Design a protein with these regions (language model features):
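Cleft-lining beta-strand/loop regions that shape enzyme active-site pockets
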Residues: 4, 22, 26-27, 44-52, ...
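Hydrophobic membrane-insertion alpha-helices, especially the h-region
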Residues: 5-18
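Extracytoplasmic/secreted envelope proteins and their assembly/folding machinery
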Residues: 32-39, 53-65, 80, 87, ...
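Acidic/histidine-rich, surface-exposed loop or edge segments in extracytoplasmic proteins
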Residues: 35-47, 85-89, 200-204, 370-373, ...
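Extended, small/polar residue-biased N-terminal targeting/export presequences
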Residues: 52-58, 65-139, 206-261, 321-323, ...
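PDZ/PDZ-like domain segments forming the peptide/carboxylate-binding groove
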Residues: 66-67, 88, 105-118, 126-169, ...
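Conserved functional hotspot residues or short segments at active or partner-binding sites
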Residues: 123, 142, 146, 162, ...
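Polar, glycine-rich mid-to-C-terminal structural blocks
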Residues: 468, 480, 485-552
Length: 712
């Protein structure tokens, strides 16, 4: 099960050949070099490069303005119209590698933020009149820019009133539910507290805006340039690429502590179990970091420093030492010396449990995979394929009779790993076709004849299962190896690859690193020739969902690539053929039609669509409270959905996992939270009954499998 290297060689050859022939950059500033590198890389390797013309200019203008003023609460109509004069000139500037529109827009943006902050500081301390019959439009697309500063001030008053109303009514609801547990406060006191909370939130908001650097805004701009070509082509600064690699690989070199901003300081939000900081037994959750010292180097007072700058000070190579000066809960100040090391992040990693319904079903393994992670940069890095195989083997050791692979909310990741993982369930054969600019598609094959698991298999998906999740679901559906259950998936049928922009420009070493561009270089196709682009994977068995009547997924993007198809390839497998999909779907449909919670989910989906279409909200306290109470009354019957544990469902940790779970109270708590959600999951309950039906109906499964799958 190995990734075909030929495609990588072709793509990289084209990339380097193109750049070796490039003339000297027109604009040799760092920003100019980055822009030059992005655009030349697009032309060299993007699946479908577009010309830099008026369409580009118009699209970039709309996207960048939306990033600068997402709620239309900063710019006035006159300022917007002033910027709009550049709407069809940006392409000329980009082709010349100049930044006139960018310069003008950030100048106006900074000015408008400063003005908005002043308005906020003046208005938040004035009394708010909630007796007026006025409304606020919450949909940005329906909003108009304020005509002048007077109208802008009115808009800010509405924004503040809306936030205060939301906070105030939430506090009143909490008071009604918890009167015996909390100090009883008057309605006026709750309103005052709501104003204080909103004031603090906006102060923090303006503080974050004030910390934005030119480089941050340039990253937004370069992202808009990249996004024009398709939604998944994007620019990554060196720091963003580092964070992406950590997220994908689940591993970093540092101290193993999660940090968050706390006023002027940085707080330890959690210490990673098993990491260097945890091993010292000195650094604790909620410690406030005051200073950071590299051993043998200078001490840096981090008061007022941006969180990402603090993170860069704390991270470092394995074996190096950092000293944190922290303030404890008792206000004592201590120095904590920590030797950096590799840190394994357990968040998002594959994990499994055993499911039983006594008298109905026995020993069904459940594997949860939140993302297709892989560590390319670090030696000994994580691989989700390896981890899933580990979970399969652990389940087999405990006599598993069926496996459920849960890919709900899994947005994808490593193509290599999904090819390997799909191969665990078939003998050998094609997994996915990928096609770039070349005429001929490339096949990613499972070349390993061994089968890691040959029993009953169900894959759970939803509308947020994307990319790699869709590859494995589509392949095993086409092979009739598994039943796919859930909702139509996201519909991302494209492949991206990172390109280091330092390699796109010769010389200029003093300005590097320039960052990376994540580029769409291929589409992937099912073995039957179809594509998941826009359409997603349609489940064999569809279950009700809250988002049924709302557009979710790739089709939401205006610049999404189109659906296409190519010729199918020959494929077959003899491990286990699922032949009773129609019968299984009918049995599930019958159960769903009688299941009170699924019926409520269908009803709730209609309500969600109706509420989404209502974008005008009253700012009169009586009207707002009445509206909220009506919503709560309408939605009260939906509260029972996935609130209680499923009757008779027994979920057990695997014996091999117990030692790790019990090594720390945090691990115990995280495990209990994981199990708690599963115990209430009616989708999982229905999948268990689908598994039972499948084992009973399918001839592929042996008499012995049918026998041991039934509880005695």
């Amino acid at each position: 099960m190995r990734y075909s290297a030929s495609l990588v060689i072709v793509a990289l050859f084209g990339f380097f050949l193109y750049h070796n022939l490039q003339p000297k950059p027109v604009n040799t500033s760092k920003e100019g070099l980055v822009l030059e590198s992005i655009l030349s890389t697009v032309q060299a390797v993007h699946l479908d490069p577009k010309p830099i013309d008026d369409t580009f200019s118009e699209t970039l203008f709309d996207d960048f303005i939306k990033k600068l003023d997402p709620s239309k609460i900063f710019l006035t109509k006159k300022e917007f119209e002033d910027l709009q004069k550049s709407k069809f000139l940006i392409d000329d500037q980009v082709n010349a590698r100049t930044f006139e529109f960018f310069e003008k827009s950030i100048l106006l943006s900074e000015k408008s933020i400063s003005r908005a902050k002043k308005i906020f500081e003046e208005e938040i301390n004035k009394p708010f009149d909630f007796s007026k019959n006025e409304t606020i439009e919450t949909d940005r697309e329906k909003r108009q820019y304020a005509k002048d500063e007077s109208e802008l001030r009115k808009l800010w008053m509405q924004e503040l009133k809306f936030d205060i109303l939301q906070t105030w009514t939430s506090k009143k609801s909490a008071k009604e539910k918890n009167e015996k547990k909390e100090e009883i406060k008057t309605d006026e006191e709750l309103k005052t507290q709501a104003v204080t909370d909103v004031k603090k939130r906006f102060e923090n908001y303006f503080k974050r805006l004030g910390e934005l650097r030119r480089s941050d805004r340039m990253e937004f701009y370069l992202s808009s340039v990249s996004n024009y070509f398709d939604p998944h082509t994007d620019y990554f600064s060196p720091k963003e690429k580092q964070d992406f690699d950590i997220n994908m690989g689940g591993q970093l070199e540092g101290i193993g502590a999660r940090l968050q901003a706390e006023g002027e300081y940085t707080k330890v939000s959690s210490v990673v179990v098993g990491g260097p900081a945890w091993k010292t037994k000195k650094l604790e959750d909620n410690d406030i970091i005051l200073k950071v010292t590299q051993k043998g180097g200078e001490t840096v007072d981090i008061a007022g420093m941006r969180l990402d700058d603090v993170v860069q000070l704390v991270r470092g190579k394995k074996g190096t030492v950092v000293i944190l000066t922290v303030k404890k809960k008792d206000n004592s100040v201590v120095d904590i010396e920590i030797e950096r090391d590799k840190v394994q992040l357990e968040d998002g990693k594959a994990k499994s449990v055993m499911l039983n319904i006594p008298g109905t079903l026995k020993n069904i393994g459940y594997i949860n995979l939140p993302k297709f992670y892989s560590s390319f940069e670090l030696e000994g890095g994580n691989s989700c394929a390896f981890d899933v195989l580990t979970e399969i083997n652990k389940l087999k050791e405990e006599d598993v009779n069926g496996i459920i692979l849960d890919l709900r909310n899994n947005s994808g990741g490593s193509l290599n790993d999904v090819v390997d993982m799909t191969g665990f369930f078939i003998e050998e054969g094609p997994i996915v076709q990928v096609k770039g600019r070349e005429d001929n598609p490339y096949l990613h094959l499972d070349k390993d004849k061994s089968v890691e698991y040959d029993g009953p298999l169900v894959i759970m998906v939803n509308q947020f299962s994307a990319s790699a999740s869709e590859i494995i679901a589509a392949a095993l559906q086409d092979y009739n190896r598994a039943i796919i259950v859930g909702t139509p998936t996201f519909g991302k049928g494209t492949v991206q690859r990172f390109f280091d922009l330092d390699r796109a420009v010769r010389g200029y070493d003093d300005m590097k690193p320039l960052g990376n561009v994540k580029m769409t270089v291929q589409k992937f196709y099912r073995v039957d020739g179809g594509s998941t682009q826009l359409k997603g994977v349609i489940p064999d068995i569809t279950l009700p969902d809250l988002y049924t009547y709302i557009d979710v997924g790739e089709k939401e993007y205006k610049n999404a690539m189109t659906w296409t198809e190519i010729k199918p390839v020959k494929y077959s497998q003899n491990v286990a053929q699922i032949t009773q999909k129609k019968a299984l779907a009918e049995k599930s449909k019958e159960r769903i039609s009688k299941h009170p919670q699924f019926l409520l989910i269908e009803e709730s989906a209609v309500k969600i669509k109706e509420e989404k279409d209502k974008t005008t909200v009253p700012l009169n306290s009586v009207s707002y409270t009445s509206m909220k109470e009506q919503k709560e009354s309408d939605n009260k019957k939906f509260d029972i959905v996935m609130k209680d544990d499923i009757a008779n469902l027994v979920i057990s940790n695997l014996n091999t996992d117990l030692e790790k779970i019990n090594m720390d109270e945090k691990n115990k708590a995280l495990n209990e939270e994981f199990l708690k959600d599963l115990r209430k999951d009616i989708y999982l309950e229905e999948v268990l009954y689908i598994m039972k039906d499948m084992i009973g109906l399918e001839k592929s499964f042996t008499t012995q499998q049918k026998k041991i799958a039934e509880a005695k």
